[in-house]
Amino acid sequence: MSIELSRRDFIGTCSAAACSVSLGMAEASGLYPGGGYTGTLCLFSKPLPGMGWRQLAQAAKSVGFGGIDLTVRRGGHVQPERATEDLPKAVEAIREEGLDVPMITTEVTSADDPAARPILSTAAKLSIPFFKPGYYQYKMINVRRELESAASQFRGLVALSKQYGMQAGYHNHEEYIGAPVWDIASVMDMLDSKWAGFYFDARHAVAEGGVGGWKIAVNLVMPRLKMVAAKDFLWQKTETGWAARNCPLGEGMVDWKYFVNALAAGGFQGPISLHLEYDVVGEAGAAREENIVAALQRDLQFLKTRLREGYGAIAGER
């Protein structure tokens, strides 16, 4: 009797097994021994670029956030070249309002980036544990070589961040290296999990992974999951074909019950950064900012409801 498997059969068997394990995690709601989510629910500062640091913190606190995922990049709330001077001021203003800054979002992709050392060293002095690096692109000429080039840069960046005690969480984003997760996972496997892990985005994972691929990705990242991005999308037919359109949480393709249950079963307690990437109708200026904050509040309440269902409770809530 032959026990040989074709390559297709082998991959199919492994995929089915991974799906089964992930499904078991997702269905095991409320099994996390800690009895609740104790991490920080953060506002990703991108949708409110006109707000100063203190105003940003006040707005976030008013609708129930516990922290800020602060943009330290071009056009962000802290410019990279001014990180040494401005990041401490920004963090001080935010913390004075009672919020935390457990993570920052950067564009840094290499230890050779002039902004890398100033940003990482300053963030470390401020006791910010996590940072999101920038993205690497496939040129679609030789993806194996392109992945290795990105891996070399990422390894160097992680080595630098380790010197300062900063943990890197790589964000899976459609159309970039890491979008299918499997590619960047091969790079992660060679690095110390204490300093390099995943910043997982279910929205992009579902866009890339369809029915079951994203669930396999959830299972794959769980042992070294650092941070989570919360956003949603749906497919929309346009004149030129189907396109992914961002939307409020719960109105799109992400299966939030499955995802949050998997997080709870996996024991995830890191920061969750709520993103607002969809268009918010309304006036310009302050009136528009009010509409954005209202949309964030609605999404945050949805997220909290799912977390209570998956984890049983959210720490600090009564």
Task: List where the protein language model places each region.
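Active-site beta-loop-alpha junctions enriched in small/polar residues
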Residues: 44-48, 71-75, 106-109, 136-138, ...
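Active-site acidic/histidine proton-transfer and metal-coordination neighborhood
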Residues: 9-22, 54-57, 74, 93-100, ...
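Acidic/histidine-rich catalytic cores of soluble enzymes
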Residues: 161-253, 260
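C-terminal segment of N-terminal export signals and the immediately downstream linker at the start
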Residues: 24-59
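Glycine-rich, proline-tolerant flexible connector loops at the mouths of alpha/beta enzymes
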Residues: 71-89, 141
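Conserved, mostly hydrophobic/aromatic
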Residues: 60, 68, 94, 123, ...
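N-terminal twin-arginine translocation
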Residues: 3-9, 19-33
